[in-house]
């Protein structure tokens, strides 16, 4: 049964309450598709009323933006550790392997960013969206800087271009390579099997080809 929380008074209490709600939403993410997770479902999982959720998040989309930041932070931290081991190697194959494997290991991050612009960046205030983008792009800049320390033969603009392509490839490839059951069944037909998308292979190839193209412009 849902319970109505006593209103949090201190900043610490508010932070703890919002984290509890985010944890509930995160648990649901491991069990259900994003489009099936409603604010009512999150409230039930957190054992609170829907009205209580609105005290900490202005909408479902706002809540998922905060989850995206958490997932982005985890992806970034793992990625930075792995990239430090490759500094100044200029090895396109290794950096592609690291970017692909780290993304595959952080499935929640890939799922969330695949619907970020089409779903989560709607029904939220300009203030919430601005704060989100500032934090999100700060995470990406850390990754860009780390990639630049590996691919020292590329300039900053080229590294930004590489990571922009990588990011949007993840956004597009993830849903295409993880179709809904109906599409999966259709792709099992022999005449449609060649439309299957291999996330790992496609992303890795894109990264390597992009690096090669950027290097050719240097020469």
Predicted segment positions?
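C-terminal peripheral helix-coil segments that are non-catalytic and often amphipathic
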Residues: 2-5, 138-153, 169-219
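Amphipathic alpha-helical interaction segments
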Residues: 20, 41, 94-98, 161-168, ...
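Basic, helix-initiating cap at the start of DNA-binding domains
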Residues: 1-33, 40-41, 45, 84-87
């Amino acid at each position: 049964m849902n319970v109505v929380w006593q209103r949090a008074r201190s900043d610490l209490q508010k932070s703890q309450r919002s984290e509890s709600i985010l944890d509930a939403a995160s648990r649901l993410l491991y069990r259900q598709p994003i489009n099936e997770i409603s604010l009512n479902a999150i409230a039930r999982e957190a054992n609170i009323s829907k009205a209580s959720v609105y005290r900490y998040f202005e909408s479902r989309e706002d809540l998922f933006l905060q989850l995206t930041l958490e997932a982005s932070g985890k992806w970034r931290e793992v990625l930075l550790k792995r990239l430090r081991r490759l500094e100044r190697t200029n090895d396109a194959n290794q950096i592609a392997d690291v970017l692909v494997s780290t993304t595959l290991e952080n499935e929640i991050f890939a799922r969330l960013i695949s619907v970020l612009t089409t779903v989560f960046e709607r029904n939220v205030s300009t203030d919430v969206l601005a704060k989100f983008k500032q934090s999100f792009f700060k995470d990406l800049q850390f990754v860009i800087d780390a990639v630049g320390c590996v691919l020292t033969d590329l300039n900053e603009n080229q590294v930004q271009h590489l990571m922009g392509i990588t990011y949007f490839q993840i956004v597009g490839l993830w849903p295409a390579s993880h179709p809904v059951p109906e599409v999966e069944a259709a792709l099992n037909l022999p005449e449609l099997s060649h439309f299957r998308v291999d996330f790992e292979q496609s992303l890795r190839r894109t990264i390597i080809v992009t690096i090669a193209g950027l290097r050719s412009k240097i020469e």
